[in-house]
Amino acid sequence: MKKLVIMMIVSCLMMLCSVGFAADDHKALAKQQQVAEKMLDAFDGEPMPLFTQVSAGFNANLKKAVDEKAFTELQKQVKQKFGTMKEAKFFTFQRFDQADRVTFIASFTKEKIVSMIFAFDKQNKLVDFAFTPVQQPEAKAAK
């Protein structure tokens, strides 16, 4: 009976510890998701956020690399290549030693599935992003 009680106490302690460790991840995800959603808003039509609002979440190097003119050109390229965004859904949050990655899966008028990946530093600033169409395997013809 004592062994059973001790096992239950140890199990409860392990569960409580895992909840405590996840609290920091939740805070980071919340901040990073806000930045990513501002980026998504810049591609989904109306109302378009101002570049200053979108770039507020950029780190210094990304701000140098992507100015307002370059960002406007990026919006045009995305619209030309993928079409208009219909919807975007949160997909994954990955933590690494030096950076975190937040991925959304979006649907556009010209591309059914686009993976929108956002990389963040440990200060929750956006350092890089990539939009990649996901090719679905073609269904084999029935014989």
Residues of each region from the PLM?
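Short low-polarity hydrophobic stretches
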Residues: 21, 54, 117-118
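Short, low-complexity N-terminal intrinsically disordered segments enriched in polar/charged residues
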Residues: 18-45
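Exposed beta-sheet edge and beta->alpha loop/turn motif
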Residues: 95-143
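Short solvent-exposed beta->alpha transition segments
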Residues: 51-97
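Positively charged n-region of N-terminal signal peptides that target proteins for export
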Residues: 1-5
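Bacterial N-terminal signal peptides
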Residues: 7-17
